[in-house]
Amino acid sequence: MPAYRSRTSTHGRNMAGARGLWRATGMKNEDFGKPIIAVVNSFTQFVPGHVHLKDLGQLVAREIEKAGGVAKEFNTIAVDDGIAMGHDGMLYSLPSREIIADSVEYMVNAHCADAMVCISNCDKITPGMLMAALRLNVPAVFVSGGPMESGKVNVNGKIRSVDLIDAMVAAADDSVSDADVEAIERSACPTCGSCSGMFTANSMNCLTEALGLALPGNGSVLATHADRKGLFVEAGHLIVDLARRYYEQDDARVLPRAIASFKAFENAMTLDISMGGSTNTVLHLLAAAYEGEVPFTMKDIDRLSRRVPVLCKVAPSVVDVHLEDVHRAGGIMGILGELDRAGLIDSSLPTVHSTSLKDGLERWDIKRTKSDSVRSFYLAAPGGVRTQVAFSQDKRFEELDADRSSGCIRDAEHAFSKDGGLAVLYGNIARDGCIVKTAGVDDSILTFSGPARIFESQDAAVDAILTNRIQPGDVVLIRYEGPRGGPGMQEMLYPTSYLKSKGLGKQCALITDGRFSGGSSGLSIGHVSPEAAEGGAIGLVEEGDRIVFDIPNRKVHLDVSDAELERRRAAMEAKGDKAWKPAPRKRRVTMALKAYAAHATSAALGAVRVVKD
């Protein structure tokens, strides 16, 4: 039977000094035999998804102590991708994921914590904590800050839901007046919480439910709604129970690696594909799998994408549908319920809250539950009040959206499309694959070809789009923006938003070894692997080369002969230390970013760092 890790620093004569320090934090004699639970918070006033988390760590801590544990809180960093977007700040976003994972490892291992509750929310924080949980493999429960309410704006006399992306698109559209841009800007992000669409933050918080590491509702109940408080209260009690089961009953089934198994990663990716989640989720799931030594790869994602239909479409893939609407339709357990009925997931797997996912679905799927309290839970509605206060609203919808033929969540028979919302493309320009969010691609451009317009930075591409140098039919190619080449693999939200604002969203393609925001849509192909800085063929494309996209057949092809590509590769290699580097660009790469770039891998491996022994 495993001993409590914390006893390393709380038991024995030689630990008198450590116990003295523990006492200085408030611990008493009777606490030294209890499980020490790390409350891993990520409060910051920089990020709307995290501004309300300050008191929530202590809420969880109080519940842990009521349940018989000892709670010790610490904080991680948290980068707001939206605020960091469009300038060199975005270079730090993806590397911050690794810093978060490392900081959790440092704190939990340095202080011999027995288990942890991870309070995350936004883009890199949930993935970073997930990587840490699988790396450490101590009992863990995830509870996020929750999505913000969608904004509401009057458009031609009609109230429409809006979000961050609407503000960006409107600002770049010369036909929209300054007054209208300001109205959308002021309305787009009305409350605390992660941005209201199926962007990266919400996608990842939804996937923690499918992995089995979070409570039902984690991905969908609003940050402002009183019902969300129950998740934090329950997480505090649950983690003490999980710790006791492992350390006192030798029940290893409660450990993250036992719960987030290969089959659980398949379930999570199946959910992701079915709801058209952010392409960044591919990157983060691969990274988490790497940390947990789970052999889940791009090949598995490709396989799943060919058989999973789209059962739910949310902004930015469609307008006027946000996480509050998904919640009203039964949330993530509602989508998982439909996937289970279609035989597309394995519901026999354990979760932190139920013996099996199937048991959880019996209670939490609105199509099968007999619980009035569960039905009431999924009626939680936006309050419509601008606020940064968690749990401050208590409005409810009058009825659930249980329409599976034309509602927010569909059954397999009435799927939005039989093909999934994400796809892996392969070809001579992306030997190890690249990713496209098919849920955001118009049917008219599922097959597309055009001449490459080459840019060796996001900034150069943005300038070309805004100065009308991109024409209908062009393929905007942005390279040397991968994990190593950027470094940091910037998100390309501004180029995709500006293409849309210029009326080119359905007339152009964009391909890059960088990545896209969860708010991106259109024919946007990212994560090209290998990246240019690693000698990938994307670094050999020349201005005007034709690139062919065939999403139905999962292909992307640079229309250049193998012999010509070999000639270009030889010419590139002949440049010596200047080979596989971008044209000069204004970019300050600090020592911290250089350290990340030195060990970063391409997107096909999740852009994780690999440090050889």
From Swiss-Prot:
<dbReference type="InterPro" id="IPR020558">
    <property type="entry name" value="DiOHA_6PGluconate_deHydtase_CS"/>
</dbReference>
<keyword id="KW-0028">Amino-acid biosynthesis</keyword>
<dbReference type="GO" id="GO:0004160">
    <property type="term" value="F:dihydroxy-acid dehydratase activity"/>
</dbReference>
<comment type="subunit">
    <text>Homodimer.</text>
</comment>
<dbReference type="GO" id="GO:0009099">
    <property type="term" value="P:L-valine biosynthetic process"/>
</dbReference>
<feature type="active site" description="Proton acceptor">
    <location>
        <position position="517"/>
    </location>
</feature>
<dbReference type="GO" id="GO:0005829">
    <property type="term" value="C:cytosol"/>
</dbReference>
<comment type="similarity">
    <text>Belongs to the IlvD/Edd family.</text>
</comment>
<keyword id="KW-0001">2Fe-2S</keyword>
<comment type="pathway">
    <text>Amino-acid biosynthesis; L-valine biosynthesis; L-valine from pyruvate: step 3/4.</text>
</comment>
<keyword id="KW-0460">Magnesium</keyword>
<dbReference type="InterPro" id="IPR000581">
    <property type="entry name" value="ILV_EDD_N"/>
</dbReference>
<feature type="binding site">
    <location>
        <position position="81"/>
    </location>
    <ligand>
        <name>Mg(2+)</name>
    </ligand>
</feature>
<feature type="modified residue" description="N6-carboxylysine">
    <location>
        <position position="124"/>
    </location>
</feature>
<dbReference type="Pfam" id="PF24877">
    <property type="entry name" value="ILV_EDD_C"/>
</dbReference>
<comment type="pathway">
    <text>Amino-acid biosynthesis; L-isoleucine biosynthesis; L-isoleucine from 2-oxobutanoate: step 3/4.</text>
</comment>
<comment type="function">
    <text>Functions in the biosynthesis of branched-chain amino acids. Catalyzes the dehydration of (2R,3R)-2,3-dihydroxy-3-methylpentanoate (2,3-dihydroxy-3-methylvalerate) into 2-oxo-3-methylpentanoate (2-oxo-3-methylvalerate) and of (2R)-2,3-dihydroxy-3-methylbutanoate (2,3-dihydroxyisovalerate) into 2-oxo-3-methylbutanoate (2-oxoisovalerate), the penultimate precursor to L-isoleucine and L-valine, respectively.</text>
</comment>
<dbReference type="GO" id="GO:0009097">
    <property type="term" value="P:isoleucine biosynthetic process"/>
</dbReference>
<keyword id="KW-0408">Iron</keyword>
<dbReference type="InterPro" id="IPR037237">
    <property type="entry name" value="IlvD/EDD_N"/>
</dbReference>
<dbReference type="InterPro" id="IPR004404">
    <property type="entry name" value="DihydroxyA_deHydtase"/>
</dbReference>
<feature type="binding site">
    <location>
        <position position="491"/>
    </location>
    <ligand>
        <name>Mg(2+)</name>
    </ligand>
</feature>
<feature type="binding site">
    <location>
        <position position="195"/>
    </location>
    <ligand>
        <name>[2Fe-2S] cluster</name>
    </ligand>
</feature>
<dbReference type="InterPro" id="IPR056740">
    <property type="entry name" value="ILV_EDD_C"/>
</dbReference>
<dbReference type="InterPro" id="IPR042096">
    <property type="entry name" value="Dihydro-acid_dehy_C"/>
</dbReference>
<keyword id="KW-0100">Branched-chain amino acid biosynthesis</keyword>
<feature type="binding site" description="via carbamate group">
    <location>
        <position position="124"/>
    </location>
    <ligand>
        <name>Mg(2+)</name>
    </ligand>
</feature>
<keyword id="KW-0411">Iron-sulfur</keyword>
<keyword id="KW-0456">Lyase</keyword>
<dbReference type="GO" id="GO:0000287">
    <property type="term" value="F:magnesium ion binding"/>
</dbReference>
<dbReference type="GO" id="GO:0051537">
    <property type="term" value="F:2 iron, 2 sulfur cluster binding"/>
</dbReference>
<keyword id="KW-0479">Metal-binding</keyword>
<feature type="binding site">
    <location>
        <position position="123"/>
    </location>
    <ligand>
        <name>Mg(2+)</name>
    </ligand>
</feature>
<protein>
    <recommendedName>
        <fullName>Dihydroxy-acid dehydratase</fullName>
        <ecNumber>4.2.1.9</ecNumber>
    </recommendedName>
</protein>
<feature type="binding site">
    <location>
        <position position="122"/>
    </location>
    <ligand>
        <name>[2Fe-2S] cluster</name>
    </ligand>
</feature>
<dbReference type="Pfam" id="PF00920">
    <property type="entry name" value="ILVD_EDD_N"/>
</dbReference>
